[in-house]
């Protein structure tokens, strides 16, 4: 039986995985100082930037499940970075809001994330970085 021709090191999946691991490691080093995980950072950034106000909305942005999101939100709330408040429109619904401490922390983390992004793209021109992002978004949409 003839072996199929496939070079792992030339596949997109291989490189996406290696890049993801390296980015995650870089961010985890920065997040370790704050005793946060990358998923907790994702929640904070989405509450800060995307006008997300409920745990259900967070599911769209974090690729988590309800149980894990609840646990992550509980931890962030216990650390004082966010709070649950009753929705003025629907008394059954709880809204998530960053506390003042959560806003300050998230802004510090955004600065750290920008540094990591700069490190990642240090060998690319501005045009290459823009093109790469556009191509990655195109791939993401098609999946």
Predicted regions and their residues:
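C-terminal regulatory/oligomerization modules of transcriptional regulators
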Residues: 1-5, 126-143
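N-terminal leader segment of winged-helix/HTH proteins
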Residues: 1-34
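Alpha-helical structural segments
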Residues: 18, 22, 48-49, 61, ...
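N-terminal helix-turn-helix DNA-binding core of bacterial DNA-binding proteins
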Residues: 21, 25-67
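Charged, amphipathic alpha-helical coiled-coil/dimerization segments
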Residues: 24, 74-134
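Conserved amphipathic alpha-helical interaction elements at protein-protein interfaces in regulatory
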Residues: 29, 33, 49, 78, ...
């Amino acid at each position: 039986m003839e072996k199929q021709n496939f070079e792992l090191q030339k596949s997109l999946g291989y490189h996406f995985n290696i890049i993801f691991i390296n980015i995650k490691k870089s961010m985890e080093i920065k997040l370790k100082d704050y005793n946060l995980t990358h998923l907790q950072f994702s929640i904070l950034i989405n509450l800060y930037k995307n006008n997300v106000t409920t745990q259900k909305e967070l599911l769209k942005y974090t690729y988590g499940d309800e149980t894990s999101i609840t646990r992550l939100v509980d931890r962030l709330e216990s650390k004082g970075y966010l709070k649950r408040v009753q929705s003025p429109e629907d008394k059954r619904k709880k809204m998530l809001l960053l506390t003042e401490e959560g806003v300050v922390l998230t802004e510090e983390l955004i600065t750290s994330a920008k540094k990591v992004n700069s490190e990642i793209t240090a060998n690319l021109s501005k045009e290459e970085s823009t093109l790469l992002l556009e191509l990655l978004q195109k791939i993401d949409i098609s999946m």
